[in-house]
């Protein structure tokens, strides 16, 4: 192992904290009306998000100082724990149901979403597998199939909740990691055909997914039903114009756009801060992606490279899906916007992941 740098990637730290700060401001702005109506406290969601942010930042700086090889050592145990929690959440009376998905476990006044932490555990485990078996990754039987086996076993359990959004991000992240490891294009084509068949099957197996597809193609066909959320999102994004209506001046958060502080927070941000504000957020994520790629390229070993690739891919895929949903480019999937959307498990997981990335940067050659 090369000598550790005196400090991690400072620009990555700054970008992360800047996104987090913007997120805290927007969570309050987006949720104040609903929080005041439901809890008689306009700061209800903002205070909880601030608590999650504090826990996440402490975890990020702690993990930043933990040798990333520790995750390699404990990756199997982490996977076992996450699999156990994923099964536990399916048990009636243990798992909590929200918006049709049994994805949470109650812990006092709060709840955790095990599938979020499975994403990071999967990255640590798959990076270990790929770094040890890279010479076999071009083999369909000895490399490609075993790598995907553990991924899809977790995906199937997550789909029992069901949580297509989180499962899609996890699988997409792992596919990028396997591709970077050197898997053959022909194997991905074969996987794509199987995946397309599976996707069609998943859509047809649940009426609400069919409604999501039809509302995506033509949301105005059912403006008060399946198309309501995306229409209200577009009503937020469009009027924002170039400079926005002003911070705190959103109209859609007045009970038009459901739960605007979660998956659709980018719509409120675009309405209040306009095209300029939305572009700034995309620019910040682009810089974060650039720093992550540099860290992956400069990592001293394959494990560090694969971990960095996995983390930055997870963030990038989640950003693309979330903004794609908000702008009507893809069907609604229920994915948070990293660092900005309200949600304790998602925010804590993302900050922990950045902590791992920062530790890899302390060994990076760039």
From Swiss-Prot:
The record's family statement is: Belongs to the SEDS family. SpoVE subfamily.
Q: How is this protein named in the record? A: Stage V sporulation protein E
Q: Which UniProt keywords apply?
A: Cell membrane, Cell shape, Membrane, Sporulation, Transmembrane, Transmembrane helix
Q: Where in the cell is it found?
A: Cell membrane
Describe the function of this protein.
May play an essential role not only during sporulation, but also during vegetative growth.
* GO-annotated biological processes: cell division; peptidoglycan biosynthetic process; regulation of cell shape; sporulation resulting in formation of a cellular spore
Please give the organism: Bacillus subtilis (strain 168)
Q: Does the keyword Chloroplast apply?
A: no
Q: What is the effect of changing residue 116 to A?
A: Severely reduced sporulation efficiency
Q: Where does the UniProt entry say this protein principally localizes?
A: membrane
Annotated membrane topology: Multi-pass membrane protein
Q: Name one GO cellular component term.
A: cell division site
Pfam families according to UniProt? FTSW_RODA_SPOVE
Its transmembrane ranges are 10-30, 50-70, 77-97, 105-125, 144-164, 185-205, 227-247, 264-284, 306-326, 337-357
- Please indicate if the UniProt record lists Nucleus as a keyword: no
Q: Name the reported effect of residue 48 to A.
A: Strongly reduced sporulation efficiency
An example Gene Ontology molecular-function term: lipid-linked peptidoglycan transporter activity
What does altering residue 104 to A/F do? Answer: Severely reduced sporulation efficiency
């Amino acid at each position: 192992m090369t000598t550790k740098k005196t400090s991690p990637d400072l620009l990555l730290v700054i970008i992360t904290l800047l996104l987090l700060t913007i997120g805290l401001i927007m969570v309050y702005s987006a949720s104040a009306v609903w929080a005041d109506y439901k809890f008689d406290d306009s700061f209800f969601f903002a205070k909880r998000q601030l608590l999650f942010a504090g826990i996440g930042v402490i975890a990020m700086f702690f993990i930043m100082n933990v040798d990333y090889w520790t995750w390699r050592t404990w990756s199997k145990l982490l996977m076992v724990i996450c699999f156990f929690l994923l099964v536990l959440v399916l048990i009636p009376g243990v798992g909590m149901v929200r918006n049709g998905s049994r994805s949470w476990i109650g812990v006092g006044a709060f709840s955790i979403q095990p599938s979020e932490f499975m994403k990071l555990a999967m990255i640590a485990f798959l990076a270990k597998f790929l770094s040890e078996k890279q010479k076999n990754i071009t083999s369909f039987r000895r490399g490609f199939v075993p790598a995907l086996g553990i991924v899809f076993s977790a995906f199937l359990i997550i789909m029992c909740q069901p949580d297509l959004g989180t499962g899609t991000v996890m699988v997409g992240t792992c596919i990028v990691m396997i591709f970077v490891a050197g898997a053959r294009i022909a194997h991905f084509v074969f996987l794509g055909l199987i995946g397309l068949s599976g996707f069609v099957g998943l859509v047809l197996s649940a009426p609400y997914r069919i409604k999501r597809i039809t509302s995506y193609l033509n949301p105005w066909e059912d403006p008060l039903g399946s198309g309501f959320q995306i229409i209200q999102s577009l009503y937020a994004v469009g009027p924002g114009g170039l400079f926005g209506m002003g911070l705190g001046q959103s109209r859609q958060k007045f009970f038009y756009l459901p739960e605007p502080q979660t998956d659709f927070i980018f719509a409120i941000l675009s309405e209040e801060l306009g095209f300029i504000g939305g572009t700034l957020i995309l620019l910040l994520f682009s810089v974060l992606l650039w720093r992550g790629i540099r860290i992956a390229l400069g990592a001293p070993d394959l494990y560090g490279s694969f971990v960095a690739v996995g983390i930055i891919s997870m963030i990038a895929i989640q950003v693309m899906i979330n903004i794609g949903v908000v702008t009507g480019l893809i069907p609604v999937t229920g994915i948070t916007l990293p660092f900005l959307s309200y949600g304790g498990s998602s925010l804590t997981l993302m900050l922990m992941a950045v902590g791992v990335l920062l530790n890899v940067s302390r060994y990076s050659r760039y």
